[in-house]
């Protein structure tokens, strides 16, 4: 009996900062981050190369800062620093779990994390290390979703896995409409026409133009990441 092989060799996992909060109102929930790392470890054991882009919304959101009178660029830089904090926590948890993680930042903080250098990131992935990309794109006015699309394209990821609190993309908000159904797959064009809000427009356009598929799934469902990587019917595939 042949062992099933993963559907993807190299993935870019986009984690929101909020996902790290668990049931807390702020910060990083220890049990939640350990569980996420366990799910990622399970995938690396299949031989899949994993890169992660992490948000910072559990600590600070640039958009929120801009809305209360703060200069938007300054607020965005603060948001980038929040992602560095999350990346350090994620990397530390991975290393304690027996994985080898490398945090690479788009803004220079060389005493804390190494700078993002594409050839080095590719080398780490080929060596089986998990690469965590911090500080978004390094530029204000760009979301961490856009960073996920950008880094995914740069490293030649086969798919961007957008981990959310919902198990896919629905015809309507499942919390408000009991008749809402989950799309198993949907094209970029249809998703844009229906304004489904899967990612911000910049990130979405970049994935579409690079023909980089997006898989939306729930990080809260145990084993969902592995099922996605194995190509099973989990979440929603957005394709070109």
From Swiss-Prot:
<feature type="binding site">
    <location>
        <begin position="137"/>
        <end position="144"/>
    </location>
    <ligand>
        <name>UMP</name>
    </ligand>
</feature>
<feature type="binding site">
    <location>
        <position position="56"/>
    </location>
    <ligand>
        <name>UMP</name>
    </ligand>
</feature>
<feature type="binding site">
    <location>
        <begin position="14"/>
        <end position="17"/>
    </location>
    <ligand>
        <name>ATP</name>
    </ligand>
</feature>
<dbReference type="GO" id="GO:0033862">
    <property type="term" value="F:UMP kinase activity"/>
</dbReference>
<feature type="binding site">
    <location>
        <position position="61"/>
    </location>
    <ligand>
        <name>ATP</name>
    </ligand>
</feature>
<dbReference type="InterPro" id="IPR011817">
    <property type="entry name" value="Uridylate_kinase"/>
</dbReference>
<keyword id="KW-0418">Kinase</keyword>
<feature type="binding site">
    <location>
        <position position="76"/>
    </location>
    <ligand>
        <name>UMP</name>
    </ligand>
</feature>
<keyword id="KW-0067">ATP-binding</keyword>
<dbReference type="InterPro" id="IPR001048">
    <property type="entry name" value="Asp/Glu/Uridylate_kinase"/>
</dbReference>
<comment type="subunit">
    <text>Homohexamer.</text>
</comment>
<dbReference type="InterPro" id="IPR036393">
    <property type="entry name" value="AceGlu_kinase-like_sf"/>
</dbReference>
<feature type="binding site">
    <location>
        <position position="173"/>
    </location>
    <ligand>
        <name>ATP</name>
    </ligand>
</feature>
<protein>
    <recommendedName>
        <fullName>Uridylate kinase</fullName>
        <ecNumber>2.7.4.22</ecNumber>
    </recommendedName>
</protein>
<keyword id="KW-0665">Pyrimidine biosynthesis</keyword>
<dbReference type="InterPro" id="IPR015963">
    <property type="entry name" value="Uridylate_kinase_bac"/>
</dbReference>
<dbReference type="GO" id="GO:0006225">
    <property type="term" value="P:UDP biosynthetic process"/>
</dbReference>
<comment type="pathway">
    <text>Pyrimidine metabolism; CTP biosynthesis via de novo pathway; UDP from UMP (UMPK route): step 1/1.</text>
</comment>
<dbReference type="GO" id="GO:0005524">
    <property type="term" value="F:ATP binding"/>
</dbReference>
<dbReference type="Pfam" id="PF00696">
    <property type="entry name" value="AA_kinase"/>
</dbReference>
<keyword id="KW-0808">Transferase</keyword>
<feature type="binding site">
    <location>
        <position position="57"/>
    </location>
    <ligand>
        <name>ATP</name>
    </ligand>
</feature>
<keyword id="KW-0547">Nucleotide-binding</keyword>
<keyword id="KW-0963">Cytoplasm</keyword>
<dbReference type="GO" id="GO:0044210">
    <property type="term" value="P:'de novo' CTP biosynthetic process"/>
</dbReference>
<feature type="binding site">
    <location>
        <position position="164"/>
    </location>
    <ligand>
        <name>ATP</name>
    </ligand>
</feature>
<feature type="binding site">
    <location>
        <position position="170"/>
    </location>
    <ligand>
        <name>ATP</name>
    </ligand>
</feature>
<comment type="similarity">
    <text>Belongs to the UMP kinase family.</text>
</comment>
<dbReference type="GO" id="GO:0005829">
    <property type="term" value="C:cytosol"/>
</dbReference>
<comment type="function">
    <text>Catalyzes the reversible phosphorylation of UMP to UDP.</text>
</comment>
């Amino acid at each position: 009996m042949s062992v099933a092989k993963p559907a993807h060799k190299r993935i870019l996992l986009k984690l929101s900062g909020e996902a790290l909060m668990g049931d807390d109102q702020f910060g990083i929930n220890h049990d939640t981050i350990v569980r996420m790392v366990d799910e990622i470890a399970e995938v690396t054991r299949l031989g899949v190369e994993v890169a992660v882009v992490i948000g910072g919304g559990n600590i600070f959101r640039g958009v929120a800062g801009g809305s209360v009178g703060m200069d938007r660029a300054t607020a965005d830089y603060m948001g980038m620093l929040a992602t560095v904090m999350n990346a350090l926590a994620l990397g530390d948890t991975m290393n304690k779990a027996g994985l080898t993680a490398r945090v690479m930042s788009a803004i220079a903080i060389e005493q804390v994390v190494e700078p993002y250098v594409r050839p080095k990131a590719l080398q780490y992935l080929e060596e089986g290390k998990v690469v965590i990309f911090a500080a978004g794109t390094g530029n204000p006015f760009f979301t961490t979703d856009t960073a996920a699309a950008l880094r995914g394209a740069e490293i030649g990821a086969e798919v961007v896995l957008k981990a959310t609190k919902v198990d896919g993309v629905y015809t309507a908000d499942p919390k408000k409409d009991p008749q809402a159904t989950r799309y198993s797959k949907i094209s970029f064009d249809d998703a844009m026409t229906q304004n489904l809000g899967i990612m911000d427009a910049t990130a979405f356009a970049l994935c579409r133009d690079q023909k980089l598929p997006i898989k939306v799934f729930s990080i809260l469902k145990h084993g969902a990441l592995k099922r996605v990587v194995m190509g099973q019917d989990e979440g929603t595939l957005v394709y070109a």
